[in-house]
Amino acid sequence: MIDWITSQGQGVLGAYWTPLWILIRAVIIVVPLLLCVAYLILWERKLIGWMHVRIGPNRVGPLGLLQPIADVLKLLLKEVMMPTQVSRGMYLIAPLMVLMPAVAIWAVIPFQAEVVMADVNAGLLYVMAISSVGVYGVILAGWASNSKYAFIGAMRAAAQMVSYEIAMGFALVTVLMVAGSLNLSAIVNGQNTGYFADMGINILSWNWLPLLPMFGVYFISGVAETNRHPFDVVEGESEIVAGHMIEYSGMGFALFFLAEYINMIIISTMTALMFLGGWAPPFESVVTNAIPGFFWLLIKVFLLLSVFIWIRASFPRYRYDQIMRLGWKVFIPLTVAWLIIVAIWIKSPWNIWH
């Protein structure tokens, strides 16, 4: 589909098509992301409200649906306060260094068969590489802010992200081993073949079942990577107020939160693609096959995002040493052990993948 649009555009506009197409793709990615983040925040506040037996936002617009618009306007109109002793250049560029990798990842994420901005063969490697870059913006913000609280938060973020990146990487390596491809579309298609898929029970052929420990490790590590509760010691309110964001206000502060929620959506989308069959329906039938694959992916991502929120509402914050212990002493040994088990499984007569 993308190739057809490109060929048609080049035929009509010639050399002008390339910069125009880059701009169009950027808009196609960014605008829906902004809307998704705005209403994800509203859904989070609503869902936590219901879990706390209260209503949640319900004043701005019908049923509170305009609350995200009001929040955006509030942040846009706030004065940007810059402390006098900050490293100005690094202070200003840090929020962008956190946000840009989160946006760039969407270039290779497929939304259904043949609907992807760039269908590259090394898509999984690209995601793993780009997702590691955001921590530099966090470290830069902590260093440039000239604040002890911000610096402590940045150091915590660096240690936490490095710790859980390893476990996430091993979890994705197991998916790579069973799929035999780094292409995200090929990984999704590989989950919808086999004995159960032939019977029309796709849900039992997805990677979540044979790779169940990796599924859990990847998603929980994703919660830690995004600094979400109960892993939010990076911005622990009771200790360091807001961590690396403490000296930011207005849109600088908003960009950090925007990146956090975009990363939540990325983790949920990657979990759905790697372990939950992507855009495939759970069961084959006339009704489920009539629903476009994009909507199945959307449903899975929405449910995983709701789990993010449920975790926030249900668990207390871990201590910093507990978070490090979980990453290094539990997740990494577990993923290495399961990696070896899967390698032996693939080479055994009971191989269910190839």
Swiss-Prot record:
It is found in: Cell inner membrane. PROSITE patterns: COMPLEX1_ND1_2. One of its GO terms (cellular component) is plasma membrane. One of its GO terms (molecular function) is NADH dehydrogenase activity. Pfam families: NADHdh. The gene is nuoH. This is NADH-quinone oxidoreductase subunit H. PANTHER family: NADH DEHYDROGENASE SUBUNIT 1, NADH-UBIQUINONE OXIDOREDUCTASE CHAIN 1.
